[in-house]
Amino acid sequence: MMKALVVGGSSGIGLSLVLQLLHSDKVEKVYVVDKAAFPESHREERVDYVCCDLSRNDFSVLNRMNDIQALYITAGFGHLDFFQKLSEPYIDDSFAVNAVAPIKIIHRYYDRLLAQEDFACAVMVSIAGRISSPLFSVYSATKAALSKFIEAVNVELEVQGSRNRILEVSPGSLKGTGFTGGESQPELTADLAKEIIEHATRHEELYIPQYEEVFKDVIARYEADAHKFGVESYWYKKNSGRA
């Protein structure tokens, strides 16, 4: 039997991960840490929800969750707009929630990653952290920081003899997550949640959904000419009505 922690598990892909974990009879408990309340429609006795605002930099609620064998961090937010329109509090909160909180939470459980026992760990990053993303300047900066952190720490885990790794999950836009507003639709992200759990359980380091179909070409175009790619990215967002 195992216990898992899902940070950001009340909505979006986090909620889908919780529901997929609960499908397994090997899962004894799923801790859910989120600012938003866990949906009543999905509550059951194996779900242990605790309210926590990651922007407050207080993770003491995790003190009693030291018996987990899997960690999934999905909390994060972003706002599409010109940089000059973003407030300083927004910038502070963006880095606190999207980058600092995941890093500090992983630090709390790092002894589990270093140990010889299996410890599954996955963090939702974003393809925006790997390419030029105008109008997502601060969001992409927070995700780039997180991506580089994961990349470096995975090497540290390897050279210290651990087989555990942190899985970076870097998708593009996802339907059903409620990221850009609206309700979460976990049925639309169920397959992705299954994939994340499988990749994390295999101790893989990077998972980009739809890589072959979409993002292999996207990344190649960015690496060929980052400036041209950035300009095209801006106009794509503008012409598609996202900006």
Please provide the spans of the model-predicted regions.
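C-terminal helical subdomain
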Residues: 164, 168, 180-221
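Active-site loop immediately N-terminal to the catalytic Tyr-X3-Lys motif
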Residues: 133-137
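N-terminal Rossmann NAD(P)H-binding glycine-rich loop of SDR-like oxidoreductase domains
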Residues: 10, 14-19
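Conserved NAD(P)H cofactor-binding loop of Rossmann-fold oxidoreductase domains
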Residues: 74-80
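Residue(s) in the substrate-gating loop at a strand-loop-helix junction
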Residues: 126
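Active-site helix of classical SDR
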Residues: 106, 142
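Substrate-binding pocket helix/loop in short-chain dehydrogenase/reductase
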Residues: 82-83, 90-93
